[in-house]
């Protein structure tokens, strides 16, 4: 969709991969559908502008992320001859910012014909899940996107990511408005605690 916990990283990574791949029956009940008609991504995505560290501003709570705070995701390029050339490192603190640190490492590949806005992400072997960048901000002076909204076709998963741990009030309001415009139920959003600046 990520300092985030590594996917595949233990059972948590397996759950993430299988849920995202639509195999939730294997790992328990998924969350409620927050968007019955997930739209196609709004704009092309440049991989170069997407790479780097992201902070999770909010999400739809999911079993594999339950209780996670201080969530981050970092994307970088892998040295590989295959198509899964993106490294994903997901990190969080369990049950609070002073909780146990958890990290997972996965890989991702861009879906052909998606203008860079759709990825397939795996944290466990051959299992890949959908990761759609539904919208993102215009590149800043450093050439990177300042925010992104990530979802997938089922409408059960949603993430809002920013480059700053503590986005300002204007960006928070803009993210909420855009999430609503995309058809998501804001009442299901769980805001993520991040460390103060």
Regions found by a protein language model. Give the residues of each.
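Bacterial N-terminal signal peptides that target proteins for export
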Residues: 2-15
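A beta-rich soluble binding module of mature secreted/lumenal proteins
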Residues: 2-3, 26-197
């Amino acid at each position: 969709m990520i300092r985030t916990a590594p996917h595949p990283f233990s059972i948590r990574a397996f759950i993430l991969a299988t849920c995202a791949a639509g195999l939730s029956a294997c790992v328990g009940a998924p969350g409620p559908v927050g968007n019955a008609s997930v739209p196609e991504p709004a704009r092309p995505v440049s991989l170069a502008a997407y790479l780097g560290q992201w902070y999770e501003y909010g999400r739809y709570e999911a079993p594999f992320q339950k209780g996670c705070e201080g969530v981050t995701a970092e994307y970088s390029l892998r040295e590989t001859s295959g198509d899964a050339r993106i490294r994903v490192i997901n990190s969080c603190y369990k049950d609070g910012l002073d909780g146990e640190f958890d990290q997972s490492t996965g890989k991702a590949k861009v879906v052909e014909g998606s203008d860079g806005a759709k990825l397939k992400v795996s944290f466990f072997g051959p299992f890949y899940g959908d990761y759609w960048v539904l919208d993102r901000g215009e590149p800043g002076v450093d050439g990177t996107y300042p925010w992104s909204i990530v979802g997938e076709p089922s409408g059960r998963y949603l993430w809002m990511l920013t480059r700053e741990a503590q986005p300002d009030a204007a960006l928070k309001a803009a993210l909420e408005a855009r999430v609503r415009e995309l058809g998501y139920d804001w009442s299901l959003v769980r805001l993520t605690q991040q460390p103060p600046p």
